[in-house]
Design a protein with these regions (language model features):
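Juxtamembrane extramembrane loops of integral membrane proteins
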Residues: 312-314
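Alpha-helical transmembrane segments of multipass membrane proteins
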Residues: 54, 135, 139, 202, ...
Length: 318
C-alpha cells in the first residue's frame, strides 16, 4: 500500500484519464477516485465487480492447476508443519492462532467504529464499516462457492480463504491506513509493519496447527490487500480533515491486547484438541512381518537434522 500511496498522484491521473476516455465504465471508476464525486454507490459496484473478478480468477487457477484438489505446495507445507509439531510450541502457537478469532477481532472493530461515530468522523466510519462488511461477505461467498478438500484435522467450519487471515489483514491494514496519514515522515511505516507482523504470525500459527492449506492463507492475505488498495486509496483521496490519532491508536491496540489476553488462554485447549495431529497406526501380521513385512518399515529416524537420523537397527514384534 505504501508504494501505491507514494505513486498515488500519477496512478490517479492515469485512472482519471482512462475514465474520461471510456465513459461507460469510466463513470464508476471516476466516482471512486475523483474527490468531487460521491462514493457510496460506486464503491458498492466496485466491490461487486472485484468480488466477481477475484472469484473467476481463483476458480480458473484452481481448475487449471489443482483440478479442485490441494496444490502440491499445500501438501508439502502441511507435511512440513506436521513434522515441526512440538508440545513446547503447540500452546504458544495455538494462542497466536486464537488472535484471529472473532472474539479477539470483533471488540476491536466495534470500539473503533463507535469511537469514529462519537467523534463524528463519518467518512472514516463509513470506510471502516465498508472494509469489514466486504471482508465478511467475501469470505462467506467464496467459502460457499469454492470447494477445496480441507486438511485432515480440519472441521467443516474452515475453508478457502481463511476468514481469520482475511479479516486480520483488513482490520489491521485499514487501521494502518487510517492513522499512518497523520504520522510524520518515516514513522508512517510502523502501523504497516505492526499489521504485517500480526497477520504473518496468525497465518503461520494456523498453518502450524493444520487449520488451513497454504493457499487458504495466501488467498486471505491477497483478497484483504486488494480491498485495502481500493478502499484505502479512495479514503486517502477524499479525507482532508486531520484528527488526533493517539486516542484511537491506544484504543485499537490496547483493546486488541486485552481481548487477546482474555480469549487466547481460554481457547488454547479447545484449539489443540480440535487440531490435534493425527496419529497414524499401522499393523502388520506377525507372519508377514517375519517374511518380508519388516522391509518397508523406516530404516532411520525421521529428522531434519542429518546427525540425528539414526539407523533403526532393531525391530520388535509385539
Amino acid at each position: 500500500y505504501r508504494w501505491f500511496a507514494t505513486h498515488a498522484d500519477a496512478l490517479l491521473a492515469r485512472a482519471l484519464a482512462w475514465s474520461h476516455a471510456h465513459p461507460v465504465l469510466g463513470r464508476h471508476t471516476a466516482a471512486v477516485f475523483d474527490p468531487t464525486r460521491r462514493e457510496s454507490v460506486p464503491l458498492a459496484l466496485l466491490a461487486i465487480l472485484l468480488l466477481a473478478i477475484v472469484w473467476v480468477w481463483f476458480a480458473f487457477l484452481i481448475i487449471v492447476i489443482g483440478h479442485g484438489e490441494p496444490l502440491a505446495m499445500d501438501l508439502w507445507v502441511h507435511e512440513l508443519m506436521r513434522a515441526l509439531r512440538n508440545p513446547l510450541a503447540d500452546r504458544p502457537l495455538a494462542a497466536l492462532a486464537s488472535l484471529g478469532d472473532e472474539q479477539a477481532l470483533a471488540p476491536v472493530s466495534l470500539l473503533v467504529l463507535a469511537y469514529l461515530c462519537w467523534r463524528k468522523r463519518w467518512m472514516a466510519a463509513g470506510h471502516w464499516l465498508a472494509a469489514l462488511a466486504f471482508g465478511l461477505a467475501l469470505t462467506a461467498w467464496l467459502g460457499a462457492s469454492v470447494d477445496i478438500p480441507k486438511p485432515p484435522s480440519v472441521s467443516s467450519g474452515f475453508g478457502f480463504p481463511s476468514i481469520a487471515v482475511t479479516m486480520s489483514t483488513i482490520i489491521f491494514g485499514f487501521f494502518a491506513v487510517l492513522i499512518a496519514r497523520e504520522l510524520p515522515g518515516r514513522t508512517r511505516v510502523w502501523p504497516y509493519l505492526v499489521s504485517g507482523i500480526v497477520v504473518a504470525l496468525i497465518g503461520f500459527a494456523r498453518l502450524y496447527l493444520g487449520a488451513h492449506w497454504l493457499s487458504d492463507v495466501i488467498g486471505g492475505m491477497l483478497f484483504g490487500l486488494v480491498w485495502l488498495l481500493v478502499l484505502g486509496i479512495a479514503y486517502r483521496r477524499r479525507m482532508v480533515r486531520s484528527f488526533w490519532i493517539k486516542p484511537i491508536a491506544w484504543l485499537f491496540y490496547g483493546s486488541f491486547v486485552l481481548a487477546g489476553l482474555w480469549h487466547a488462554p481460554r481457547n488454547v485447549e479447545r484449539m489443540l484438541a480440535q487440531f490435534q495431529a493425527p496419529v497414524i497406526e499401522r499393523s502388520v501380521a506377525l507372519q508377514d512381518w517375519w517374511t518380508q513385512g519388516w522391509q518397508p518399515l523406516p530404516a532411520r529416524r525421521n529428522e531434519f537434522d542429518d546427525e540425528q537420523r539414526w539407523p533403526l537397527d532393531v525391530q520388535v514384534a509385539g
